[in-house]
Regions:
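N-proximal low-complexity "stem/linker" segments adjacent to membrane-targeting elements
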Residues: 1-27
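Conserved donor nucleotide-binding strand/loop of the catalytic core
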Residues: 33, 47-75
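Cofactor-binding loops of NAD(P)H-dependent oxidoreductases
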Residues: 60, 84-86
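Acidic helix N-cap motif at the loop->helix transition within catalytic regions
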Residues: 19-22, 44-53, 93-94
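Short, acidic, metal-binding catalytic loop of nucleotide-sugar glycosyltransferases
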Residues: 26-35
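Catalytic-site signature of metal-activated, phosphate-bearing donor transferases
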Residues: 67-73, 79-84, 91-252
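A conserved acidic beta->alpha catalytic loop
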Residues: 27, 39-48, 85
Length: 252
């Protein structure tokens, strides 16, 4: 371990995240040495909130999640970067760890436990209730890939795990869910078209009941009550909608 604490830059990309961005920023304050916010054209008051928290957002046209996050990392002035989504709130325990972070001579990236929250309820059961994304890393050994969606960090070196957690407040209401659902399925549809692969709209549509059973029963969301049921129903339509959008794009 190093003898001195390592300075950390938190980097956030956002667009129209007025519902959650303030709590994200306030949770970070006092625990990291720098906060970088990259916005791709918010129109809902997000920029006003960021500025009211004493930060100046940087505009960068959206090129996909991987490239956008890598651009944000390039603005960081510290070697260690904490990548935080605009709907992720770090816990006080994680904040304390970040303040006392000393780094490692061999570990270049750390995973952080992320708890999933949907419509005000933290899921405690089933697939997706929590995951371990790489969120803290050295920018000289790690970088985001160029994926348009479902981006990941490429790591050179060992990967560790920190004890603290972050809360993924993905969808505070159904309007926000549907907004993101529409955005993600549109990106996924473009990827399908660009890949040249053909998928049956009819077959994918007929699979919706099976996707629901997998989400609700096999993956254990039945244990998350009504919230788990709603999540399972909505998620079951994702494959069909992205394939249907790809079909529509090809017809244009």
């Amino acid at each position: 371990m190093n003898s001195a604490f390592q300075p950390i830059s938190a980097v956030i990309i956002c667009k129209n995240e007025v519902r959650s961005i303030r709590s994200v920023l306030r949770a970070l304050k006092g625990h990291v040495d720098e906060i970088v916010v990259v916005d791709s054209g918010s129109t809902d008051g997000t920029l006003d909130v960021v500025r009211s928290e004493g930060l100046e957002p940087v505009f960068h046209a959206f090129e996909g999640y991987g490239k956008q996050k890598q651009f944000a990392c390039s603005l960081a002035t510290n070697l260690w970067v904490l990548s935080v989504d605009a709907d992720e709130v770090i816990s006080p325990e994680l904040g304390q760890e970040l303040q006392e972070f000393q780094g490692s001579s061999t570990i270049t990236a750390y995973r952080i436990t992320r708890r999933f929250r949907f419509l005000g309820r933290t899921f405690k059961h089933g697939h997706g209730a929590s995951d371990l994304p790489i969120r803290l890393f050295r920018t000289d050994y790690c970088r985001f890939d160029d994926a348009e969606v479902h981006e990941s960090v490429k790591v050179e070196g060992e990967i560790g795990l920190v004890d603290g957690e972050m809360l993924h407040e993905s969808y505070v209401d159904l309007a926000q869910y549907l907004e993101k659902f529409n955005r993600y399925t549109s990106i996924a549809a473009e990827q399908i078209v660009n890949s040249g692969k053909s998928r049956s709209v009819v077959l994918t549509g007929l699979m919706i009941p099976f996707y629901f059973l997998k989400n609700y029963v096999v993956w254990g969301n039945i244990l998350n009550g009504t919230h788990g049921f709603i999540w399972s129903v909505l998620s079951s339509f994702y494959p069909f909608v992205k394939v249907a959008k790809a079909w529509a794009l090809r017809k244009q």
